[in-house]
Design a protein with these regions (language model features):
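Transmembrane helical elements of multi-pass membrane transporters/channels
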Residues: 25-40, 173, 198-210, 214, ...
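Helix-loop junctions and terminal segments of transmembrane helices
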Residues: 74-89, 159, 283-325, 379-384
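Interfacial segments at transmembrane-helix termini and the short loops linking adjacent helices
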Residues: 22, 120-140, 274, 322, ...
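Membrane-water interface segments that mark the loop-to-transmembrane alpha-helix transition
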Residues: 20, 24-36, 40, 62, ...
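Signature of the first transmembrane helix
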Residues: 3-7, 20-82, 113-117, 143, ...
Length: 506
């Protein structure tokens, strides 16, 4: 990919803060992501081996709640960093922005934590469909505070385009989570409580690293511009984050709707329903690793697209987003092929044969996770156009579709019905987001359409997906239908550049 966002393009006063180009960002992130994802995969296997389905289901519900409550409790303030850190940095007001948002996030987080401590029975019923998990709710409140802090630094460093630091924080988080999780499960209690504590501890450790880095470079942040009035700053931030907050709320509800339907609306007891969620969790272990790659790459892309957008290079934004979606979608489908081929070994040996229900729904879990990752990337265009509120339309329709189809299919097909409902809802959301971006000037090309259709084949088995992927490779190499000549040139130039860099190291 082209390197349009170099440090030299930034104001001179911002030079002490190192930024990474988009091409460098992708390479760095992918390199460190390999290690991080390997650690995460091994950790997930151990959790599935040691925890029974009901305990695994409890952890799944807690994690879903943390992902929902984190941005919800702070009104998604940190989501504005990707859009406005560059804006205030160029106006030499960045320290003001960070101070005010940090104080606001801390106050909102304290209020949320107090609510969890004061109403443990209510939250236990909400999360687990039973009022007797108050001890676990207390641990959740502590972990939530750490999650909010961790999200603050990840969003900030992403906005500063310091991908090395983001990848490092993610790696630290993964390593500490694995070490604490294994240690607590073996040395304290083989239950969901240990995993919740471990995750909170990992977020705390990563946040401390973020605090250390920011404190050492605080004086390099520009602040000699006139401070913006509180009304001006909060109006700008909240007009953007309000819709991002609603979008985040809907996206997280969208993600956990099927599991909440299983827990709250199935005819099974709370323990049996949580066990079904545990089976579902086992089918999502690897697919979620794949989709996390897409969402991380998508969040990394936002400030670069925003940079091009601010400079008026709208055509470049369209071309970059199309190419990004094609490459990411293809790699996710390759990952799905590998997962399907290795599924018997994964579920039979690594998971000790405990999750037959998870194996049965794995193909459709892979399918909807890929579509989820792709619409997460596509909505970057809405964010750049400051039309994040339009994304809520697609998410709301998708959420209602998910709930409606779950009501219809869950009683008849059980866990498979819940997964099919989620797959259909993700496809509909993807189509709606692409339609909305088209109204704002985004033009999806033929190659992107082909890649987005490939996940349908996953349910036919590994051989079918292999044939389709090989056909795509041949078409991309021999024609300009999937990759244009300019895109091939760009990829070859980037490959040649990195090849020279690698050779220079030897």
């Amino acid at each position: 990919m082209s390197q349009s966002c170099t440090a030299s393009e930034l104001p001179t006063s911002a030079a002490p803060l190192r930024t990474d180009t988009l091409a460098d960002s992708v390479l760095i992130l992918l390199a460190l992501m390999v290690v991080q994802r390997l650690v995460g995969f091994c950790r997930a296997i151990l959790f599935c081996r040691w925890l029974d389905p009901a305990q695994l289901g409890q952890w799944d519900m807690v994690f879903g709640f943390l992902m929902l409550a984190g941005p919800l409790s702070v009104v998604a303030l940190t989501s504005s960093f990707g859009r406005y850190v560059e804006y205030y940095r160029q106006r030499r007001q960045l320290r003001v922005l960070l101070r005010r948002t940090a104080v606001a996030c801390a106050a909102l987080a304290a209020v949320t934590m107090a609510l969890l401590q004061l109403l443990p029975g209510w939250f236990s019923e909400l999360i687990f469909a039973t009022p007797d998990k108050t001890r676990l709710v207390g641990l959740v409140s502590l972990s939530l505070l750490m999650v909010i802090a961790f999200n603050y630094f990840v969003d900030l460093f992403n906005a500063l385009r310091n991908v090395r630091l983001i990848a490092g924080l993610q790696l630290i988080n993964s390593l500490v989570f694995a070490a604490l999780g294994v240690g607590l499960l073996l040395g304290w209690r083989c239950a969901a409580e240990s995993v919740v504590l471990a995750y909170g501890g990992a977020c705390l450790a990563s946040s401390l690293v973020g605090i250390w880095w920011l404190s050492r470079r605080w004086h390099a942040l520009p602040e000699d511009g006139p401070p913006p009035a509180h009304r001006e700053l909060w109006t700008k931030l909240l007009s953007f984050t309000t819709w991002v907050w609603v979008t985040s709320l809907l996206a997280n509800l969208f993600d956990i709707a099927d599991r909440y339907m299983i827990v709250h609306f199935s005819s099974a007891s709370s323990t049996e329903a949580l066990a079904q969620v545990g089976h579902y969790h086992s089918s999502r272990v690897v697919p979620l690793l794949l989709v996390s790659v897409a969402t991380l790459l998508g969040s990394m892309l936002t400030p670069h697209l925003s940079h091009d957008w601010e400079l008026g290079r709208r055509d470049l934004v369209v071309r970059r987003l199309n190419l990004f979606m094609k490459l990411t979608g293809f790699l996710l489908c390759v990952g799905a092929l590998v997962v399907l081929a290795a599924a018997p070994l994964l579920f039979g040996v690594a998971f000790r044969g405990k999750f037959a229900g998870g194996l049965a729904v794995l193909p459709w879990t892979l399918t909807y996770c890929i579509w989820f990752g792709m619409w997460s990337i596509a909505q970057n265009y809405l964010w750049c156009a400051e039309k994040a509120r339009l994304g809520t339309v697609a998410l709301l329709v998708g959420l209602l579709t998910n709930v409606g189809l779950n009501c219809l299919l869950l009683p008849r097909l059980g866990l498979l019905g819940a997964v099919l409902a989620t797959a259909a809802a993700n496809l509909l959301t993807l189509v709606l987001i692409l339609a909305l971006t088209r109204r704002l000037g985004f033009r999806i090309d033929r190659g992107t359409c082909v890649i987005l259709a490939v996940p349908v084949v996953i349910s036919l088995g590994p051989w079918a997906i292999l044939v389709v992927l090989l056909a795509i490779v041949v078409a991309a190499l021999t024609t300009d239908q999937l990759l244009s000549a300019d895109e091939k040139h760009e990829l070859l130039d980037s490959w040649g550049d990195y090849r020279r860099r690698l050779l220079s190291l030897w």
